[in-house]
């Protein structure tokens, strides 16, 4: 009796004090309060290192374009000096016209060259920016999809989507496009200042008096805007989470007529984002206005002093004109830099959120590389396993579970909802690691086994299987990464009693099932999921029987498919049907995280214990009146524990 099961009993003490558990999980609980080690702008720039060659060419083109922008005022000033000459004699007039024509020709050459270089610079920087955002999104998605399941238990999907799309876009602009503009304006400013000093060092020093004041203001403004931008992006991510949640549960929303509630809930978060955005707009507006006023005042003072120098003969009219044009060009570049600084501060807030995720280290140990196969292939053992979900560390779900499944055996788990049945299946799949104890496959602890090998050997069919928004064929072959032939897929579908309904569709195996398989019925989804598991040909099967209402024919087809799936495999089934329990080699009753009874169906009934009470309560309950013993449910749908 119960040969496939070992039980340890006795008093169980809490494995970890509540404070210790909480500290171990602080990165999950604190969320955005955990700061990445390095979010400096240099790290953002490093994202474009793969395009360094193209960016060097773009930078050279940028320098030429910036120089051309400054040379135009220089030759414009020459034209002023030429037309200011005394040209009363015909030969002087002819010479002046020749000089003007030659100067204009120089200006045309400069403008054409600058335009070509500007186009080249824009093309190279923009193409690099697209590659940067693609690379960043791939890296971020790859990092996220390899995080432990506990991370997704406490992190909203909408927030992750916001970081993948919106935040990466902001960083892209900062890393390339805005960098291009910043370099252009810095170069233009530097060259312009050089020409200004060459024209009149006195006027230049006067123009630069205001620079220290502006620098201090920009620094303080940048710090404030960076934090405000971070808060705005965080609020937008929460709004995205609500929208994603509402769309994903739209049938539940509709069935409870809660559309207006969801609209209100989303609107409240959007209003929070709007409030922060308006505050940000106000601050940016005040800063831009103040900067513009300071720059304009500086130009006015320079013009007044320059006019005085010209009147007194220290400058020519052309030189003053060139200087004014230089100062306007430099002022325009500085103003553009202030706008780019605003964007960079926003990118700093976004990069903090993205790099926080990229720097996050999974709390689960890395998988090993062992691929254990022996004469006991398919043996699973849980040895004194204690476990609490990271999102609820103070609530111990499993308390010293010891359970052994011999190859080819069938063990059924029954018991009250919340007892820990589904948690046992989750741990065997290594969705989580136990806090204490070991789980072994073929005698090897799960952390030492190759991730790919483990999930080729172990498959799970849950109560509500999840299908992807692709064809039925792609869903069935999902675990084999497209390496399954059409014949293999069709054979698996036949074994799962899915072939006939698939062939009834116009596109047959090419039929797209919709998001989460929404275009298929419950029974059809379950049979496709069974076919997917059959194609993987696992040695260990974790089966959570569906308790959702199916019509008699669908229930028969699903049950028949499950029987085919279980043949010749080690099976751990979370049982809800009496027929499944009767056919099990061992039945384990799970209550409050412990195995309280075990044995065969008949042995447990003869003991007149908890199992007997469960069966009697279910068979005598009003919801099962008229239900035969063969199909009666042992336990209502569990709550995922």
From Swiss-Prot:
Molecular function, one GO term: ABC-type transporter activity
Record-annotated ABC transmembrane type-1 domain positions: 55-346
Membrane topology: Multi-pass membrane protein
Name of the molecule in the record: ABC transporter B family member 25
Knocked-out gene: effects: No visible phenotype under normal growth conditions, but mutant plants are hypersensitive to aluminum.
Gene: ABCB25
Task of the protein: Metal transporter involved in the sequestration of aluminum into vacuoles, which is required for cellular detoxification of aluminum.
Species of origin: Oryza sativa subsp. japonica
All residue ranges annotated as the ABC transporter domain in the record: 380-617
GO BP of this protein: aluminum ion transmembrane transport; detoxification of aluminum ion; response to aluminum ion; transmembrane transport
Residues bound to ATP: 415-422
Lineage per the UniProt record: Eukaryota, Viridiplantae, Streptophyta, Embryophyta, Tracheophyta
InterPro entries: AAA+_ATPase, ABC1_TM_dom, ABC1_TM_sf, ABC_transporter-like_ATP-bd, ABC_transporter-like_CS, P-loop_NTPase, Type_1_exporter
UniProt superkingdom: Eukaryota
Residue ranges the record marks as coiled coil: none
GO cellular component, as recorded: membrane; plant-type vacuole membrane
Keyword Ribosomal protein: no
Keyword Transmembrane helix: yes
Localization: Vacuole membrane
Pfam families: ABC_membrane (PF00664), ABC_tran (PF00005)
Residue ranges of the TM segments: 52-72, 100-120, 191-211, 284-304, 320-340
UniProt induction comment: Induced by aluminum in roots.
CDD domains noted in UniProt: ABC_6TM_AtABCB27_like (cd18780), ABC_MTABC3_MDL1_MDL2 (cd03249)
The entry's keywords: ATP-binding, Membrane, Nucleotide-binding, Transmembrane, Transmembrane helix, Transport, Vacuole
């Amino acid at each position: 009796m119960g040969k496939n099961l070992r039980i340890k009993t006795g008093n169980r003490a809490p494995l970890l004090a509540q404070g210790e558990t909480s500290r171990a999980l602080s990165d999950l609980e604190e969320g955005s309060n955990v700061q990445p080690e390095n979010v400096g702008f240099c790290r953002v720039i490093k994202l474009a290192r793969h395009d360094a060659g193209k960016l060097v060419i773009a930078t050279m083109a940028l320098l030429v374009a910036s120089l051309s922008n400054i040379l135009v005022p220089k030759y414009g000033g020459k034209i002023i000096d030429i037309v200011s000459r005394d040209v009363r004699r015909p030969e002087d007039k002819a010479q002046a016209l020749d000089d003007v024509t030659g100067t204009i020709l120089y200006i045309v050459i400069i403008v054409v060259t600058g335009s070509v270089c500007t186009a080249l610079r824009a093309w190279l920087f923009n193409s690099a920016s697209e590659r940067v955002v693609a690379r960043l999104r791939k890296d971020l998605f790859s990092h996220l999809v390899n995080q432990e399941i506990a991370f997704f238990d406490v992190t909203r999907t909408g927030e992750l989507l916001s970081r993948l799309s919106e935040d990466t876009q902001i960083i892209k602009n900062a890393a390339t496009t805005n960098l291009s503009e910043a370099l252009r304006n810095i170069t233009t400013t530097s060259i312009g200042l050089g020409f200004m000093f060459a024209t009149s060092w006195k006027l230049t020093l006067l123009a630069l008096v205001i620079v220290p004041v502006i620098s201090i203001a920009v620094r303080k403004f940048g710090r404030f805007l960076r934090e405000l931008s971070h808060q705005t992006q965080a609020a937008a991510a929460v709004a995205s989470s609500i929208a994603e949640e509402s769309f994903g549960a739209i049938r539940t929303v509709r069935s409870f007529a809660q559309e207006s509630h969801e609209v209100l809930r989303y609107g409240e978060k959007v209003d929070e984002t709007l409030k922060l955005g308006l505050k940000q707009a106000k601050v940016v507006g005040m800063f831009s206005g103040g900067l513009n006023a300071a720059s304009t005042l500086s130009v006015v003072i320079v013009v007044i002093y320059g006019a005085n120098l010209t009147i007194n003969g220290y400058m020519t009219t052309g030189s003053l004109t060139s200087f004014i044009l230089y100062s306007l060009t430099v002022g325009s570049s500085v103003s553009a830099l202030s706008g780019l600084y605003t964007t960079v501060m926003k990118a700093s807030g976004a990069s903090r959120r993205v790099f926080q995720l990229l720097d996050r280290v999974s709390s689960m140990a890395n998988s090993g590389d062992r691929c254990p196969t022996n004469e006991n292939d398919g043996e699973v053992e849980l040895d004194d396993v204690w476990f609490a979900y990271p999102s609820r560390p103070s609530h111990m779900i499993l308390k010293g579970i010891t359970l052994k499944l011999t190859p080819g055996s069938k063990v059924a788990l029954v018991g009250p909802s919340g007892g820990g049945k589904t948690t046992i299946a989750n741990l065997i799949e290594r969705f989580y690691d136990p806090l204490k104890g070991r789980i072994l496959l073929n005698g090897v602890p799960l952390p030492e086994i190759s991730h790919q090998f483990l999930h080729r050997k172990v498959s799970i069919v849950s109560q509500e299987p999840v299908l992807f928004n692709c064809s039925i064929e792609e869903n069935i072959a999902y675990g084999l990464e497209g390496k399954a032939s059409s014949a293999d897929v069709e054979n698996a579908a036949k074994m799962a009693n899915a072939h006939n309904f698939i062939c009834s569709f116009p596109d047959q195996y090419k039929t797209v099932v919709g998001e989460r398989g929404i275009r298929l019925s419950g029974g059809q989804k379950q049979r496709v999921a069974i076919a997917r598991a059959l194609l993987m040909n696992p040695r260990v099967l974790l089966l959570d029987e569906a308790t959702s209402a199916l019509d008699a024919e669908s229930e028969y087809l699903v049950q028949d498919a499950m029987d085919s799936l279980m043949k010749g495999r080690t099976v751990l089934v979370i049982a809800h049907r009496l027929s499944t329990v009767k056919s099990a080699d061992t039945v384990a009753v799970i209550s409050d995280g412990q195995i309280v009874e075990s044995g065969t169906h008949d042995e447990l009934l003869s003991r007149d214990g908890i199992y007997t009470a469960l069966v009697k309560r279910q068979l005598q309950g009003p919801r099962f009146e008229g239900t035969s013993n063969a199909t009666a449910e042992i336990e209502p749908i569990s709550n995922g524990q």
